[in-house]
Design a protein with these regions (language model features):
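Single conserved hydrophobic/aromatic residue that forms the stacking wall/gate
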Residues: 273-283
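Conserved "landmark" site that anchors the functional core of diverse proteins
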Residues: 1-275
């Protein structure tokens, strides 16, 4: 069995580039450790499929503006996610396909355009990083996982270890790719806290009828939404607190719609705590 290692130098780290894997750090939320992992796990997994990796292999998540990476050894990569300019040694190359990067060449991922926020880079063999609680995903607030628990910085050195190829590398077909847009229609299942003891019928009608806008103060912990203020079916949270959104601690999931005060938040993979706020389910 031949095992090869690919060394990678981060010439430019980009706005927020981290190492993630899928499905992340599972089973520890009950003790305050969120799963982390990719925000857009479909694009992430498809990047791995393109280069012949298991869907779980560690790769790079790029937010807004991407990195420039020099490969000391020949490697196969794929770039997926939001549309962004991608070049190898200055020559434009497509996303969603396996690409060969020759030794000494530079893969450059530019800034996203008007559609989407995150881009994913997979390298055949997966990005090497030490596992912490069963995952290589970066959790920056906890300062663990990935590259020393932080975003990548200029000058960082990474590596990818390739075993003999056991999966077929392939182009990701157009109908397999997620459709990126500035307007998304989300499927919602009303959860137990959508009951009339918490929200009025008019609140639920507003939830389904409103075109919400994403607030600028959004990140991997959650996507805050701008929309109508709930009327609320009660004046306070009783023993749980003064605001009608307050409830006793309750389990939640990534993608749940949580009302913290009057602000709806789509919960992200790096949220720290069990939220004492009512929520509906989204998918």
């Amino acid at each position: 069995m031949t095992i090869t290692s690919t060394a990678i130098t981060v010439l430019r780290a980009g706005a927020l580039t981290t190492i993630q894997d899928w499905p992340g750090r599972i089973g520890y939320w009950k003790v305050g450790v969120p799963p982390s992992g990719p925000m857009d796990d479909l694009s992430f997994r498809l990047a791995n499929i393109a280069v012949g990796n298991p869907a779980s292999a560690a790769g790079l998540e790029v937010t807004m503006a991407g990195p420039a990476l020099r490969f000391d050894d020949t490697a196969v990569v794929a770039v997926t996610g939001a549309p962004a300019p991608v070049t190898i040694d200055g020559k434009p190359v497509p996303q969603w396909v396996p690409l060969t990067v020759d030794a000494g060449s530079v893969l450059d991922v530019g800034a996203v355009g008007s559609l989407g926020m995150r881009v994913y880079v997979a390298v055949a063999g997966g990005i090497d990083a030490e596992e912490y609680l069963g995952s290589r995903s970066t959790f920056t607030m906890g300062r663990f996982g990935g590259k020393d628990g932080r975003r990548l910085e200029d000058g960082d050195r990474l590596s990818a270890t390739s075993l003999p190829e056991v999966r077929t590398r392939r182009r990701i077909l157009f109908d397999e790719q997620p459709a990126f847009s500035n307007a998304w229609q989300l499927g919602v299942t009303v959860g137990p806290h959508g009951a009339p003891e918490f929200f009025t019928p008019e609140d639920i009608d507003d939830l389904f009828a409103t075109a919400y806008e994403v607030h600028f103060n959004s990140d991997r912990t959650g996507v805050r939404l701008i929309g109508p203020q709930p009327r609320w079916a009660r004046t306070d949270g009783g023993e749980a607190g003064l605001h009608p959104s307050n409830i006793h601690d309750n389990a939640y999931s990534v993608g749940a719609l949580d009302f913290t005060g009057d602000t709806p938040i789509l919960l992200g993979p790096c949220l720290l705590y069990t939220s004492p706020s009512p929520r509906d389910r989204t998918r």
